[in-house]
Design a protein with these regions (language model features):
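Hinge/lid segment of periplasmic solute-binding proteins
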Residues: 92-156, 176, 290-296, 358-362
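Periplasmic-binding protein-like
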Residues: 43-44, 187, 331-351
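Extracytoplasmic/periplasmic solute-binding protein
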Residues: 136-152, 157, 176-226, 232, ...
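Long, aromatic- and glycine/proline-rich binding clefts that accommodate carbohydrate-like moieties
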Residues: 28, 121, 125, 291-296, ...
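A bilobed periplasmic-binding-protein/Venus flytrap-type ligand-binding module shared by bacterial periplasmic
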Residues: 160-164, 308-322
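Short, solvent-exposed loop/beta-turn-alpha elements that line the ligand-binding surface or hinge
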Residues: 109-120, 195-199, 215-236, 283-288, ...
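Glycine-centered hinge/linker elements that transmit conformational signals in sensory
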Residues: 180-185, 222-253, 294, 298
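Conserved N-terminal structural module of periplasmic/extracytoplasmic solute-binding proteins
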Residues: 2-103, 252, 300-303, 323-324, ...
Length: 429
């Protein structure tokens, strides 16, 4: 019988095991996966790792911790070359940091060749240096983009909206969302036109990202000049703040859980949310609005974009079982496996899986996710983005608490971010 271990929140055990000797010659190879805990990977680890084991005879071990705990352990493993893990599960934001520091193996050198069925926006996130856009200081402008990471589970922010409130057609504009909110919100009965993640740092930045880009703004211009205090960005934040009267009290402290639960309990008409919440909307044990929520790409102002946020994976540069790790990547990224993954309720990263009729019937949100992935925009591809995001997200949170003064808060964020970037070697202007 094939055996697989799940060691949740026990990363120390994995490190100790890696240092404790090699075992006997007859012992099967065991791939050690390191990941942060998230329901988005449950189908993979619960259903597809056992299938991989059965198909290949390679055992797997899934080591899991909270988001920040796993990030620190993975960084330590990469820096020390301890070899405690074969495969890292990463937020797509981590790819520039891990690849740039040499913590990931070059997948091209290991023989991985992506086929044309990959969604371009998904596979491109695994390249370093990035295929498009700015390159951070120290990265040769002539360096060829190289594949260091692959998509593992697709994720993107889409608009969840109440069909019983908006009607058969999705809101055509952001003004439509605000108009319906102003007409139909009833805070006394806990009926709100909008809900958002407003907590400082990454949560509020994720919420603001789509509006920033939809209104024609961007984080950076030429030579990493900070532009998130441009007139377009100020207009976007002013609109974001104009929704506050139609939101629950305390949204400046909301993270994803509070945002999603407000929608599932029937208290909000719309929100931009990650796709991991899709299945829950139709689960009677979790949702009071079963079959009342539909999904689409957020509406257009000047642009129409969605925020990418994929689960990515890569082979650790110090992995003891690189060949078997690549065997897993080749297996899981096969189109037939991705189709089965989509039919099981996973969010795939291959076009054929998104277009599979059985998968589309079982998961009615796949069409919206595919459209959103097609127009998706990632966070800026620099290992220093997390610091800039924290700066901007802190000032966005202050704007929510202040309920106004959009330009002042964005100017303050821009000044602080510019100072940081210049200290880190960016031209920033």
């Amino acid at each position: 019988m094939i055996r697989r271990q799940f060691l949740k929140n026990s990363l120390g055990a994995a490190t100790a095991a890696a240092l404790s000797g090699c075992g006997t010659k007859d012992q099967r190879v065991q791939l050690t996966f390191g990941s942060y805990a998230d329901p988005g990977v449950d189908i993979l680890k619960d259903e597809f790792l056992p299938e991989f084991e059965k198909a290949t005879g390679i055992a797997t071990e899934w080591v899991e911790a909270d988001f920040s705990g796993w990030l620190q352990k993975a960084l330590n493993d990469g820096e020390t070359k301890a070899g405690a893990f074969d495969i890292y599960v990463m937020d797509d934001l981590w790819v520039p940091r891990f690849a740039g520091a040499g913590y990931l193996a070059n997948l091209e050198e290991l023989g991985f060749r992506p086929d044309a069925d990959f969604l371009p926006t998904a596979i491109d996130l695994g390249c370093w240096p990035p295929k498009n856009g700015l390159r951070q200081p120290g990265v040769d402008a002539a360096a060829k983009p190289t594949l260091f990471s692959l998509p593992l589970v697709s994720d993107v922010q889409i608009l969840f909206y109440r069909r019983d409130i908006f009607g058969a057609s999705p809101p055509a504009s952001w003004d439509d969302i605000r108009r319906v909110a102003s007409q139909k919100s009833n805070p006394g009965k806990r009926q709100y036109g909008w809900v958002t993640r407003g907590a400082r740092g990454n949560p509020v930045m994720n919420s603001f990202f789509v509006l920033l880009h939809d209104f024609g703004g961007a984080e950076f211009g030429e030579n990493w000049k900070v532009t998130f205090n441009s007139p377009q960005a100020v207009e976007a934040l002013e609109f974001y703040l104009s929704l506050l009267p139609y939101e629950p009290e305390g949204v400046a402290e909301f993270d994803s859980d509070q945002e999603g639960e407000t929608l599932l309990q029937g208290s909000a008409f719309a929100a931009t949310i990650w796709t991991g919440w899709c299945r829950q909307t139709d689960d009677p044990s979790r949702s009071r609005v079963v079959n009342k929520i539909d999904f689409c790409v957020p509406p257009r102002k000047i642009n129409r974009v969605a925020k990418l946020g994929l689960f990515m994976t890569g082979v650790a540069a110090s992995a003891p079982h690189k060949a078997e790790a690549v065997e897993f990547l080749k297996w899981f990224t096969r189109s037939d496996v991705q189709i089965r993954f989509a039919r099981a309720g996973g969010i795939p990263f291959k076009m054929s899986a998104f277009r599979d009729q059985e998968a589309r019937t079982k998961s009615r949100w796949l069409d919206a996710i595919l459209e959103a992935m097609t127009v998706g925009v990632p966070s800026p591809r620099t290992s220093d983005w997390s610091k800039v995001e924290d700066i901007l997200g802190t000032h966005l949170n202050l704007a929510l608490l202040d309920k106004g003064n959009a330009k002042r808060h964005l100017d303050n964020a821009a000044a602080e971010a510019t100072a940081f970037l210049k200290s880190a070697g960016y031209h920033a202007g």
